[in-house]
């Protein structure tokens, strides 16, 4: 059986961190993929580096995807993914752009692509509840995520989870089952989801 990976895509406050923690609790093979990050803001869950280092990796063909958001630069690098899967781990990637989901999916793993969704009001409540200092920026990103989904409505997903209707534990169990079953991807009713 080939190695597996999980992509969690969704707006801020959709539960990516919480669900990743639940996945690791269910099965220690699941491990958060810590993206490279250059710039200000939160450092937990990232490998802090410089923009120059990200550029160096990109020139060497080792960056699968990079993006800028919240005044910082982020990258998903092939060496770290290879190290995790080589150690028998199941990397869990947090994504905020469908283009990134598509780019990373090119890596030959059995990807389980999960769309996490919650309404704007839930994002606002969760971001305020966890003490985010940039709630307005995160609400702007919620709208960008919604538009990103509408712009890529044909993108197939293994699962679409309404995180305002499920506990993190329930969501993690659904994802774990999808990995165990080798769930494929199918086109979903994105327009109906984000209305």
Each language-model region and where it sits:
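P-loop (Walker A) phosphate-binding loop of NTP-binding proteins
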Residues: 11
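Conserved phosphate-donor/acceptor-positioning beta-strand/loop module used by diverse small-molecule
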Residues: 92-96, 106-128
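Hydrophobic anchor at the beta1->P-loop junction of P-loop NTPases
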Residues: 8
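Small-molecule kinase domains that catalyze NTP-dependent phosphoryl transfer to phosphate-bearing small molecules
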Residues: 101, 129-180, 186-195
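ATP-binding Walker
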Residues: 14
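ATP-dependent small-molecule kinase phosphotransfer cores
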Residues: 36-98
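Walker A/P-loop
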Residues: 17
């Amino acid at each position: 059986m080939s190695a597996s990976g999980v992509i969690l895509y969704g707006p801020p406050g959709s539960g990516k961190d919480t669900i990743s923690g639940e996945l690791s609790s269910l099965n220690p093979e699941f491990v958060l993929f810590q993206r490279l990050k250059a710039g200000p803001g939160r450092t937990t869950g990232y490998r802090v580096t410089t923009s120059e280092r990200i550029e160096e990796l990109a020139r060497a063909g080792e960056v699968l995807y990079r993006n800028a958001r919240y005044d910082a630069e982020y990258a998903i690098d092939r060496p770290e993914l290879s190290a995790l899967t080589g150690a028998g781990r199941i990397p869990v990637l947090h994504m905020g752009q469908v283009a990134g989901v598509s780019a990373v999916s090119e890596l030959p793993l059995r990807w389980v692509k999960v769309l996490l969704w919650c309404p704007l009001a839930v994002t606002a409540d969760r971001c305020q509840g966890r003490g985010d200092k940039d709630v307005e920026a995160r609400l702007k990103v919620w709208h960008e995520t919604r538009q990103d989904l509408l712009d890529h409505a044909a993108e197939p997903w293994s699962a679409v989870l309404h995180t305002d209707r499920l506990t993190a534990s329930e969501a993690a169990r659904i994802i774990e089952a999808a990995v165990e079953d080798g769930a494929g991807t199918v086109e979903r009713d994105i327009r109906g989801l984000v209305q």
